[in-house]
């Protein structure tokens, strides 16, 4: 799951403060900051295309539509919309040609290019992707300027160590890992696609190598892989590199091109969203251990070495290994209490069967709109990291928001076989959920006595119906791995007493207390 603290460390943020009041004391008179603000304000002139100007020139993609960003990530093309070596090379090429046109010699062009890159790093707030690409470009320029004859791979390794010294937590930045690893393999095995082959084949090979290298990073961070991304890149790489990017830079200078750029952006987004609507190429893969990651990189390194020699048969072994990883399960028998903040969610797994009790859900306060299901950041990544694609039983202890609201999200993102409700009348939330279940043809039941799953029984302890939803909670008793579990939902003291009077369960090993322990 997403580790906010580790993310902040990777961005060189080591503490968080709350500002109670703010007062403008004076303007920053620094020349560089003034120029930076002027350049950013220039981008605001392009009203329609500003999000992409901001993303592809200044490295800030916070203005991009979240659904579009999700489609880019799902299609495996998000790297094209973060500043990378391609963007730096185009910018540097434009600047280099400009210096040549006004009569600067080779040596002066190199020095001014270094200053340009240093200022560009400052302009983009020293973002991780810009730092990596710019430091590498500066290393290549210095290598050429002083004729050091250092290989590009060694320049990249030197760049890596510089970034580690500046911020060791860069290793936790996914973009940095993508950038360094893919660049390393593309440079090290550049003979694979530097031969006399067609542009389409060269683009495919670059995408193929990039996909294989990025596979473990994708799996261990997103737990899903789109196997069509190699082919999607055949369209998006040339389109973004040779059409969209040049228009972004040109429109920044010539504002009247904004309408054309906006049309290209819409085309790009529509195609990405259309492709993202197809789910068949997306495979959920459970998290890879360090052992499997090491073995994987050894295998693909051997494969690339053989491809350099023109031998392609080893690719079949790589594909078989990836297929094995995709169907490998990391689902031990057990009970996991998932942290969903204010709410409940419990995962029970045995004999490859999956039972999810409650889904959590964010409580709404006042007019605050409910937008982001907590299950998206907690339950979904956790289940996917275990390779879970299907939930055999989704048990709703009762219809309170903090137990059942994200059930809508769960049934939208997982194959759910059956849903179990508690006794008593359905509340409004449960009625809405039932409408969704009917549309998806998902079976649902209520007020059941027990579930028998592969000779493991979950007993639903019934003591009659109550006047409040909390005491009508499904109370579940089960034995797993030699331990006795009791899940109380939001049941209060009255129902606890009734259960103890009716059932002999005083020797429970693990008790999930009712109503989060507050009643």
Task: Place the predicted regions along the sequence by residue.
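Core dinuclear metal-dependent hydrolase active-site scaffold
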Residues: 162-172, 276-393, 438-510, 515-518
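Membrane-interface amphipathic/re-entrant loop segments adjacent to transmembrane helices
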Residues: 24, 29, 74, 219-235, ...
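Hydrophobic alpha-helical transmembrane segments in multi-pass membrane proteins
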Residues: 17, 68-230, 287-330, 423
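Divalent metal-coordination and catalytic microenvironments
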Residues: 56, 84, 125, 175, ...
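Aromatic-rich juxtamembrane segments at the membrane interface
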Residues: 10-136, 141, 393, 458, ...
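Active-site HxH/HxHxD metal-binding segment of metal-dependent hydrolases
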Residues: 401-438
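Active-site environment of divalent metal-dependent phosphoester hydrolases
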Residues: 88, 127-131, 363-364, 399-404, ...
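Membrane-interface helix/helix-cap signal primarily in integral membrane proteins
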Residues: 1-79, 366-369, 374-384, 390, ...
């Amino acid at each position: 799951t997403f580790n906010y603290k580790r993310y902040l460390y990777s961005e060189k943020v080591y503490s968080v403060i709350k500002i109670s009041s703010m007062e403008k004391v004076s303007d920053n008179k620094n020349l560089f900051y003034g120029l930076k603000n002027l350049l950013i304000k220039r981008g605001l002139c392009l009203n329609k295309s500003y999000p992409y100007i901001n993303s592809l020139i200044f490295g800030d993609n916070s203005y991009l539509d979240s659904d579009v960003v999700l489609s880019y990530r799902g299609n495996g093309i998000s790297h094209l919309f973060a500043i990378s070596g391609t963007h730096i090379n185009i910018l540097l090429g434009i600047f280099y040609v400009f210096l040549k046109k006004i009569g600067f010699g080779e040596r002066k062009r190199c020095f001014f290019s270094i200053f340009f890159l240093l200022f560009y790093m400052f302009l983009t707030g020293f973002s991780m992707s810009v730092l990596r690409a710019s430091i590498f470009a500066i290393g290549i320029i210095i290598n050429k300027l002083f004729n050091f004859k250092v290989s590009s791979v060694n320049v990249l390794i030197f760049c890596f160590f510089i970034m580690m010294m500046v911020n060791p937590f860069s290793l936790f930045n996914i973009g940095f890992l993508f950038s360094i690893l893919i660049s390393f393999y593309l440079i090290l095995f550049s003979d694979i696609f530097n031969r006399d082959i067609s542009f389409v084949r060269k683009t495919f090979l670059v995408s193929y190598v990039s996909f294989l290298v990025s596979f473990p990073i994708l799996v261990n961070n997103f737990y899903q892989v789109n196997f069509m991304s190699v082919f999607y890149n055949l369209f998006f790489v040339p389109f973004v590199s040779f059409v969209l990017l040049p228009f972004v830079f040109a429109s920044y200078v010539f504002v009247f091109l904004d309408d054309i750029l906006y049309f290209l952006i819409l085309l790009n987004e529509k195609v990405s969203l259309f492709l993202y609507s197809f789910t068949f190429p997306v495979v959920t893969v459970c998290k890879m251990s360090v052992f499997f990651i090491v073995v994987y990189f050894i295998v693909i390194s051997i494969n690339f070495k053989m491809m350099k020699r023109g031998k392609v048969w080893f690719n079949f072994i790589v594909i078989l290994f990836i297929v094995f990883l995709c169907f490998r399960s990391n689902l031990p028998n057990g009970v996991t209490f998932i942290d969903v903040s204010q709410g409940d969610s419990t995962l029970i797994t045995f004999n490859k069967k999956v039972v999810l009790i409650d889904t959590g859900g964010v409580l709404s306060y006042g007019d605050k709109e409910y937008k982001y299901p907590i299950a998206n950041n907690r339950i979904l990544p956790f289940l996917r990291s275990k390779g879970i694609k299907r939930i055999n039983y989704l048990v709703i202890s009762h219809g309170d928001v903090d137990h059942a609201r994200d059930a809508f999200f769960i049934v939208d993102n997982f194959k759910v076989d059956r849903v179990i409700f508690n006794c008593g009348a359905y509340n409004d939330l449960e009625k809405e959920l039932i409408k969704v279940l009917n549309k998806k043809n998902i079976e649902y039941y209520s007020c059941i006595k027990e579930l028998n799953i592969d000779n493991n029984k979950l007993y639903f302890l019934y003591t009659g119906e109550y006047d409040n939803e909390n005491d009508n909670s499904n109370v579940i008793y089960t034995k797993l791995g030699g331990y006795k579990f009791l899940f109380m939902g939001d049941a209060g003291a009255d129902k606890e007493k009734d259960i103890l009077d009716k059932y002999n369960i005083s020797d429970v090993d693990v008790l999930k207390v009712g109503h989060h322990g507050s009643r």
